[in-house]
Swiss-Prot record:
EC top class named in words: ligase
Annotated gene: gatB
Cited PANTHER family: GLUTAMYL-TRNA GLN AMIDOTRANSFERASE SUBUNIT B MITOCHONDRIAL AND PROKARYOTIC PET112-RELATED, GLUTAMYL-TRNA(GLN) AMIDOTRANSFERASE SUBUNIT B, MITOCHONDRIAL
One of the GO biological process terms: translation
Keywords: ATP-binding, Ligase, Nucleotide-binding, Protein biosynthesis
Protein name in the entry: Aspartyl/glutamyl-tRNA(Asn/Gln) amidotransferase subunit B
Lineage, broadest ranks: Bacteria, Pseudomonadati, Pseudomonadota, Betaproteobacteria, Burkholderiales
Keyword match ATP-binding: yes
Pfam family, one: GatB_Yqey
Disulfide bond positions: none
EC number: 6.3.5.-
Length: 485
């Protein structure tokens, strides 16, 4: 039997406010346990929550960026459940009327054969809520500690429709969402610190069946790799269970990175289990149209719009445009290079950023803003490749590494001169070298003339070797073909 995978994601993005959503306490990460917990966070008697305007504004920003409806009136609700790190016995969230309704995110997904396809993921909602505290199970022998520093931190919970059909699509969506919230500046996106974490609702059904299968929710996935591994394992587990004649039970499960397996944590609750009701301590949230328009006017150019512009203005592929706009800083670096190098170098600039520059950044674990080679320096190197001063191969192998290491202050011209890397410009000298190569490789000449194209590549290699890589490959090709008839 053929199976179809159905996936929906719920993502918690910690909003980048300086204070908590219902109190003035700091949200800074890493403070000593319980030093950033106000009377509101501790649920002491007689205290009342006060809504943080900055959290609302960030939710509006997100809603506008995904083309959603901003609810003119939304309501906060109490989500009731008991857990040691939730002092009130309920979480303040939104249920019936969320602040952000609908919206879409378009993603680029890599298929099984390496091709890319585009897909639009529909969002159900995004709502404001407070985070819970943290249970520390490993810090005390035989006991659990509670740290309430995180309690009350503002979250935007972003919920999709069950639109994704593979782990690859889920990861592509999560990456696109992560890129967007960081781009907007509403979340720092630090997955290690829990600022961006995903829950994946996964089910399977026979191909062609309209009804959804029974879903299991994988909680608190804080890396894209874990998200992919967890979904892939869960899908295979569910298929095996069904094919063995067992029914899937709705449940909340955890992913164990050490074993690569999911395991059931508890029976999955439905909304009625949380006994939602409007929070009597908070007035309905009223958002004036003028406020929405002020936020809209202040939005930066969004990734989707910039991607479309890169395709039309620079002639890039949709994949290249998506990669270059992964972060605002990366996109700005690219545009700075093109501004100096000229539009004719738009595609080479993209190739260099996605190739050699990204490789160095990943190798050293640094961001593009910290790259030792600045846009103007890379633009000069591209200009030297374009005007034939150095070959692309020499630039990659010799010039760029020296620039990255700071030799000659990263100046391409100085490095080329100091290392004697300039391509041969004397066509007479190159012609003599090619004559010598042809004379010394009579067998390859004969094979080429008998129709073996590989022999030509061997001759090119010999010519480049004889010039110690200083010849222009295009010129070598041209002269060889001319002499070989």
């Amino acid at each position: 039997m053929q199976w179809e995978v159905v996936i929906g994601l719920e993502t918690h993005a910690q909003l980048s406010t300086a204070s908590k959503i219902f109190s003035g306490t700091s949200t800074a990460f890493g403070a000593e346990a319980n030093t950033q917990a106000s009377p509101v966070d501790l649920a002491l008697p007689g205290v009342l929550p006060v809504l943080n305007q900055g959290a609302v504004e960030r939710a509006i920003q997100f809603g506008l960026a995904i083309g959603a409806t901003i609810a003119p009136r939304s309501i906060f609700a109490r989500k009731n459940y008991f857990y040691p790190d939730l002092p009130k016995g309920y979480q303040i969230s939104q249920y019936e009327i969320p602040v952000v309704q609908g919206g879409t995110i378009t993603i680029q997904v890599e298929g099984r054969k390496g091709e890319f396809y585009e897909k639009t993921v529909n969002l159900t909602r995004a709502h404001l809520e407070e985070d819970a505290g943290k249970s520390l199970h490993e810090d005390f022998a035989g006991m659990t500690g509670i740290d309430l520093n995180r309690a009350g931190t503002p979250l935007l919970e972003i919920v999709t429709e069950p639109d994704m059909r593979s782990a690859a699509e889920a990861v592509a969506y999560a990456k696109a969402l992560h890129s967007l919230v960081v781009w907007l500046g509403i979340c720092d996106g630090n997955m290690q610190e829990g600022s961006f974490r995903c829950d994946a609702n996964v089910s399977v059904r026979p191909v062609g069946q309209k009804e959804f299968g029974t879903r299991r929710e994988i909680k608190n996935l804080n890396s894209f790799r874990f998200l992919q591994q967890a979904i892939e394992y869960e899908v295979q587990w569910q298929i095996a269970e069904i094919e063995d004649g067992r029914k899937i039970q709705q449940a909340t499960v955890l992913f164990d990175p050490d074993t690569g397996e999911t395991r059931a944590m508890r029976t999955k609750e439905d909304a009625h289990d949380y006994r939602y009701f409007p929070d009597p301590d908070l007035m309905p949230l009223e958002i004036e149209p003028a406020w929405v328009e002020r936020v809209r006017d202040a939005l930066p150019e969004l990734p989707a719009a910039m991607q479309a512009r890169f395709v039309s203005q620079y002639g890039l592929s949709a994949y290249d445009a998506t990669t270059l706009t992964a972060t605002k800083a990366f996109a700005a670096y690219y545009e700075a290079v093109v501004a100096d190098a000229g539009a004719a170098n738009a595609k080479p600039a993209a190739n260099w950023l996605m190739g050699d520059v990204s490789s160095q950044l990943n190798r050293e674990g640094i961001a593009i803003d910290d790259a030792p080679v600045r846009p103007a320096q890379l633009a000069k190197l591209l200009a030297r490749i374009a005007d034939g001063t150095v070959s692309n191969n020499t630039a990659k192998k010799d010039v760029f590494p020296a620039m990255w290491a700071g030799e000659h202050d990263g100046d391409a011209d100085a490095i080329i001169a100091a290392k004697g890397l300039k391509q041969m410009s004397d066509s007479g000298e190159l012609e003599k070298i090619i004559d010598d190569v042809l004379a010394a490789n009579a067998k390859s000449v004969e094979e080429f003339r008998s129709g073996k194209e590989k022999a030509f590549n061997a001759l090119v290699g010999q010519a480049m070797k004889a010039t110690r890589g200083k010849a222009n490959p295009a010129q070598v090709n041209e002269l060889l073909r001319k002499k070989l008839g």
